[in-house]
Every structure is written in C-alpha cells, then in structure tokens.
Regions:
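An alpha-helical, amphipathic repeat domain used for nucleic-acid recognition
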Residues: 1-217
Length: 217
C-alpha cells in the first residue's frame, strides 16, 4: 500500500492535480478522476492502476471533445486524431463508444449534416460530395443514404448563381468557358453544366440575345 501525502493543483492546468505518494510525485490526474482522493488515503497497486486507466480514458475523451469543438467529425476522423495523440487502441474504442452513447459520434448524422452544409454554402455534385465523405472514412451505406436525395441540376444552378457576379461584363464565349470550368471543378457533368450555363447567362441578359441550348463545345 502507498499513502497519498499531497494533492496539488497544477499551476498551468487547474483542471488537473499532481498526486504524491509516500512523499514523492507519482502521477497527474484530471480533477474529475481524483475527486474522491484525500491526503492520508492509502492506495493499493491495483487501485493505482485503475486510477491511471481512468485517467487515460478521461484524457482521450477530453481530446476528442476538443477535436469536436471546431466542427462535427466522422468516427474515422476522431479515431485518427486520437491515434495522433498516442492514445492506446482499446481506449480509443472506449472513447468512441462513450461518444456514441452521448450522441456525439454518429456517422449517419454526420454525413447528412455534411451534405446539408455543402448544399447550402458550397454547392457541388452528388458524386463529389460522396467522394468527400468516403475520404472521411464513412461507410458506403452512410454515404449513399446521405446523398440519395441530392439534385445535381438544382445544386449546379445554385452554385452558378453564387458565381455569376464575378463574371459580369464577360462576353458569351468567355463567360461560358469560365462558368463551365467552375461547375466542372464542383464535380458536375457536362449534361448538367450546359443547360445551367445557358440559363444563368439568359437570366443575366434578359434584354439581349439568348443562347438557349447552344452547344458548349
């Protein structure tokens, strides 16, 4: 048995404490893990190991919460981040399970939210959004479910509307090329791009000659 001789709050991390056993520094703990410890208390080696295991789980959970504080993440992204911080694999799996139970890790919800955000702020094709989600480690089932209702024609039109003001003053041929290239970079196919470019041009030049259905080649 080893006796706790001091519990000191860390100066740089007030949410953590230093534990001294038998007059010597032993280890640091999150305050939530050390909440039940008292000076003079005796700890067995088994209890010390339990405390350190709890500390590892708490450290992993706090790191995951910090990572999630910037934006929602896929489970694969969370796992990769914890690995980068040298969290042991068993602790990573325990952390992910805790996040799932708290509703903080759900790939289906993440995929739907990602598609909604992309559609609203940076419209792109169904194919490109699916590719992005797969790059984030999502399973095909979650990806397919999230993008199944994506309308490429509507999103291409929205993307073009957001872009058209930057192309004001251009002649038709240059406008057509720049807008087509922009939409192609957003992942849209030629069959979607062609009518959208004509529509956007005609809407911006209502009193001028229309170019409906003109071949973009």
């Amino acid at each position: 048995m080893r006796k706790i001789t001091a519990i000191e709050v860390q100066k740089r991390s007030p949410n953590r404490v230093n534990i001294y056993l038998d007059g010597e520094f032993a280890f640091g703990l999150a305050r939530i893990v050390a909440a039940w410890l008292r000076t003079g208390q005796e700890l067995s080696e088994e209890k010390i190991e339990q405390l350190q295991a709890e500390e590892a789980r708490e450290r992993a959970f706090q790191q995951a919460m910090l990572f999630l504080s910037y934006r929602a993440r896929s489970e694969s992204e969370i796992r990769q981040n914890l690995r980068k911080h040298e969290i042991p694999e068993p602790v990573i799996e325990q952390t992910l399970e805790r996040l799932r139970q708290d509703g903080l890790a759900n790939d289906n919800q993440f995929a739907r939210a990602w598609v909604e955000n992309r559609s609203a702020f940076r419209p792109r094709s169904r194919r490109l959004m699916a590719m992005e989600l797969r790059q984030k480690g999502l399973a095909d089932e979650a990806v397919s479910s999230a993008v199944e209702s994506v309308d490429d024609n509507a999103l291409a039109y929205e993307a073009a509307q957001k872009r058209v003001n930057r192309l004001k003053g251009l002649e038709w041929n240059e406008f057509r090329k720049k807008m087509s290239d922009f939409l192609a970079r957003r992942g849209f196919s030629y069959s979607v791009i062609a009518p959208v470019v004509n529509r956007i041009w005609n809407e911006a030049h209502k009193d001028e000659q229309h170019y409906e259905e003109e071949d973009l080649t």
